[in-house]
UniProtKB/Swiss-Prot annotation:
Region (Disordered) residue spans: 7-27
Family: Belongs to the BRX family.
Keywords associated with the record: Nucleus
Iron as UniProt keyword: no
SS bonds (residue pairs): none
Localization, UniProt: Nucleus
Annotated GO CC locations: nucleus
InterPro entries (alphabetical): Brevis_radix_dom, BRX-like, BRX_N
Highest taxon in the source lineage: Eukaryota
Segments forming domain BRX: 158-213
Biological classification of the source: Eukaryota, Viridiplantae, Streptophyta, Embryophyta, Tracheophyta
Identification of the protein by name: Putative protein Brevis radix-like 3
Amino acid sequence: MLACIACSSKEGGEDGSRGAATPHGRDAVKSLTSQLKDMVLKFSGSNKHQHYKAATAGSPSFRSRSYRRPYPGFIDDSAFMTTTRPGGEAYMYTRAAPPPPVRAASTSMATWDMTRSKSNRGWQQDAGRSPGGTTWIQSIEEEAGADDVTVVEDAVPREWTAQVEPGVQITFVTLPGGGNDLKRIRFSRERFGEDRAKVWWEHNRDRIQAQYL
């Protein structure tokens, strides 16, 4: 191509101003100039492309396997820590357990003072004084047995006391549904010892229940 350019220049010199002045000569010069520009552009573009390939040949491509993004639905939470309270205890969200059912109040022999002990078959002495100054023996609780009575309290029960015999005082509870129940039996310490109080209750239990309950 450069030889052609030299030949054209030589021929142009021999022809003199005649060839340059003709329209055909001007077109040839324009065509030659355009070809030179195209060659320069192609050559510079080729060099840039080769330089880019050489620069990126040693680096991994963003399209390669090592640069593939993970699946959007995958979340790696291994780097996250559990949120903790100031004291260091981790927050835990659990369903609260339902509260235990409320059992109906039971007024039975287990609540009577004149009962038998679970750990000691004897009688306890829990001395107390009545308003009149008489000292009474308060017995201990007995194991709940067949005489248990379950009462559903729909109103506040009313208590009242009866002197069934000299030295024997019984506190009753009026049940909301009607009738009475025993709450406490007290024996005068001056008249009853522990053994005698126990014998008295065993002999008079049925009579007291039939009369007052």
